[in-house]
A protein has these predicted regions:
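Structured core elements
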Residues: 107, 135-136, 197-198
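Conserved RecA-like ASCE ATPase "motif II neighborhood" in helicase/translocase motors
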Residues: 190-201
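Pre-Walker A (Motif I) flank of P-loop NTPase domains
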Residues: 101-107
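Hydrophobic anchor at the beta1->P-loop junction of P-loop NTPases
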Residues: 108-110, 120
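Active-site lining segments that contact anionic ligands and/or coordinate catalytic metals
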Residues: 103, 131, 193
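Feature 3881 marks metal-assisted phosphotransfer/nuclease machinery
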Residues: 2-97, 101
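Conserved glycine(s) of the Walker
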Residues: 113-115
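Conserved P-loop
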Residues: 118-188
Length: 201
């Protein structure tokens, strides 16, 4: 994993495109319908499965995604998962895809602190009834056995500092749910029953 290098960052798929100059009637149609055929949009070329778009002009804009199952461009609604709401377009796109049960694997990339883990955890909790167990994992590749040996305490004590960001995300969700004791109780029960398992990779 240390040897691969990206030669041209602009060639990396970032999951979304901004489509400028979209006619207002098409933006209104995306807003008012349950999806439109991709060929209705003349300035849209070769959408990829689950690719996200910001269609806009000088007056208005709409967030949308290409649904390969319906073969349509559909509106991305601002939604929430376990008390967590998206704060920008990218988080709205991520949450929509994470909550879509038809999509088996979602890969999120971005800078530290952009909400990737938080959104993934909130979406998993929101969809908990669809799964027997949720694993929240963090790779400890930078820690060799030699590094671990120099750290004080047992194995759990050695790993705790590296796992803390995952617990921090869970704390954020709990804080958002402070008025909803039922959901907080559900989280505690999932942890006790190991239905929510926070573990190193």
């Amino acid at each position: 994993y240390k040897n691969d290098k990206i030669e041209d960052v602009s060639q990396v798929y970032n999951g979304s495109r901004v489509i400028e100059g979209t006619e207002s009637k098409h933006i209104d149609l995306i807003y008012s319908s349950d999806g439109i055929k991709k060929n209705i949009l003349p300035n849209l070329t070769d959408p990829l499965a689950n690719e996200n778009f910001i269609f806009r002009n000088d007056q208005k804009s709409v967030l949308a995604t290409y649904d390969p199952f319906a073969n349509k461009i559909i509106r991305v609604n601002k939604t929430e998962a376990y008390g967590i709401s998206p704060r920008n377009a990218e988080q709205s796109f991520a949450l929509q895809i994470l909550l879509d049960q038809r999509i088996q694997l979602v890969s999120l990339s971005g800078k530290a602190g952009t909400g990737k883990t938080l959104l993934a955890l909130a979406s998993a909790l929101q969809s908990r009834k669809s799964y027997k167990q949720i694993f929240l994992a963090r790779p400890i590749v930078p820690l060799s056995n030699r590094d671990l040996g120099f750290l004080p305490g047992d194995i759990q004590s050695k790993l705790d500092p590296y796992m803390q960001p995952l617990y921090d995300n869970l704390s954020v969700i709990r804080h958002q749910l402070k008025a909803n004791t039922k959901r907080i109780r559900q989280i505690n029960e999932m942890l006790e029953q190991e239905k929510l398992n926070i573990t190193p990779l």
